[in-house]
């Protein structure tokens, strides 16, 4: 339909241009006739005199204005003839497309009628049940797509030829795809069911494959985190993080130690001393004495003075 509309627009434009050129030709011919009749109002003597003067001017000028107008009108006529030829070709193309569309619709209606008649004959059959009859019923019961330029019964549209390499001989495979419509009984589900029937451990293999994928994804996430923690521990940030009570268990993914030494009630962490006040034990930080570096330490050390 879009092509027909485009052809119609082009045809209308060509007709419009042809009419405009025809108007130009008429105007030029009118101008020539006016120039020729300009001396009718003069007297016979004056007309004779003007005719003599005109002949003299024509002798001096090789091409008069009348000749120029005639040549221009002739060129316009040629252009109009070319436009008329183009217009006729466009009209023929439009008629051809309309005729093809009509014939296509007529053929599709006849195909649909024949398909319905086939279904009626299949329903009237009461004999032995054959597999080919079921396939024919399925084939005739498919929907006809009128927007896909089908000129035949609704056969499935084949995909393009496969350009992949054949696994056996290494050459390009020129065979079409084996996929067909499920309505004909040869769909992908049918092939898959046959493969599952042939393989005895189809279900368990799929589940084990899923578990392996899950474990692989978990390992990809955990291993980089373990590497970062190892680098932090090696650089000295590990004890500081443990002092602050940061949990590095990673949601239970890292293994716990089997046995951990329990801290005794009277034991304090490094850097603190046990002090008993009023019968209550406390861990306090050791006292630090600030001593100027210049008077005591010859070489400055940032770790000097730690308990």
Swiss-Prot record:
Gene ablation phenotype (knockout): Reduced number of constricted and large chloroplasts. Attenuated PDV2-induced ARC6 dimerization in the chloroplast intermembrane space leading to an abnormal morphology of ARC6 rings thus compromizing plastidial division. Altered localization of ARC5/DRP5B in cytosol only rather than at the constriction sites of enlarged chloroplasts. In pd116, reduced number of dumbbell-shaped and large chloroplasts in mesophyll cells, with sometimes unique giant chloroplasts.
Membrane topology: Single-pass membrane protein
Topological domains, Chloroplast intermembrane: 235-307
A GO molecular function held by the record: phosphatidylinositol-4-phosphate binding
UniProt keyword annotations, A-Z: Acetylation, Chloroplast, Coiled coil, Membrane, Phosphoprotein, Plastid, Plastid outer membrane, Transmembrane, Transmembrane helix
Compartments reported by the entry: Plastid, Chloroplast outer membrane
The keyword Membrane is annotated on this UniProt entry: yes
Phenotype for residue 307 to D: Impaired ARC6 interaction, and reduced number of constricted and large chloroplasts
Broad class of the protein's primary localization: plastid
Location of Phosphoserine modifications: 50
Tissues in which the protein is found: Mostly expressed in young leaves.
Superkingdom of the organism of origin: Eukaryota
Chain coiled-coil ranges: 76-103
Expression induction: Slightly induced by gibberellic acid (GA).
Biased composition (Basic and acidic residues): 46-61
Gene Ontology cellular component terms for the protein in this record: chloroplast outer membrane; mitochondrion; plastid
Description of how the protein assembles with itself and partners: Interacts (via C-terminus) with ARC6 (via C-terminus) in the chloroplast intermembrane space; this interaction induces ARC6 homodimerization and leads to the formation of a heterotetramer containing two ARC6 and two PDV2 subunits. Interacts with ARC5/DRP5B.
Name of the protein in its database record: Plastid division protein PDV2
Originating organism: Arabidopsis thaliana (Mouse-ear cress)
């Amino acid at each position: 339909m879009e092509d027909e509309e485009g052809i119609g627009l082009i045809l209308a434009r060509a007709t419009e241009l042809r009419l405009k050129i025809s108007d130009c030709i008429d105007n030029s011919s009118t101008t020539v006739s006016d120039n020729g009749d300009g001396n009718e109002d003069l007297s016979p003597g004056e007309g004779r005199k003007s005719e003599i003067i005109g002949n003299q001017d024509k002798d001096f000028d090789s091409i008069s204005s009348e000749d120029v107008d005639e040549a221009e009108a002739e060129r316009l006529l040629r252009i109009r003839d070319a436009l008329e030829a183009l217009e006729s070709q466009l009209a023929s193309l439009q008629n051809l497309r309309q005729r093809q569309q009509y014939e296509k619709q007529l053929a599709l209606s006849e195909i649909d009628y024949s398909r319905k008649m086939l279904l009626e004959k299949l329903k009237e059959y009461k004999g032995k049940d054959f597999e080919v009859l079921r396939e024919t019923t399925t084939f005739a019961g498919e929907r006809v797509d009128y927007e896909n330029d089908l000129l035949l019964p609704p056969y499935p549209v084949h995909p393009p030829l496969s350009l992949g390499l054949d696994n056996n001989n290494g050459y390009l495979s020129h065979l079409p795809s084996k996929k067909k419509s499920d309505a004909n009984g040869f769909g992908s589900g049918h092939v898959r069911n046959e493969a599952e029937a042939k393989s005895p451990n189809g279900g368990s293999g799929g589940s084990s494959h899923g578990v392996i994928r899950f474990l692989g994804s978990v390992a990809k996430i955990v291993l980089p985190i373990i590497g970062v923690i190892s680098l932090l521990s090696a650089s000295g940030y590990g004890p500081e993080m443990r002092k602050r009570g940061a949990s590095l268990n990673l949601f239970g993914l890292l293994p716990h130690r089997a046995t951990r030494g329990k801290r005794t009630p009277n034991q304090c962490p490094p850097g603190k001393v046990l002090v008993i006040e009023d019968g209550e034990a406390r861990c306090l930080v050791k006292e630090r004495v600030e001593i100027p570096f210049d008077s005591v330490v010859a070489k400055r050390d940032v770790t000097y003075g730690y308990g």
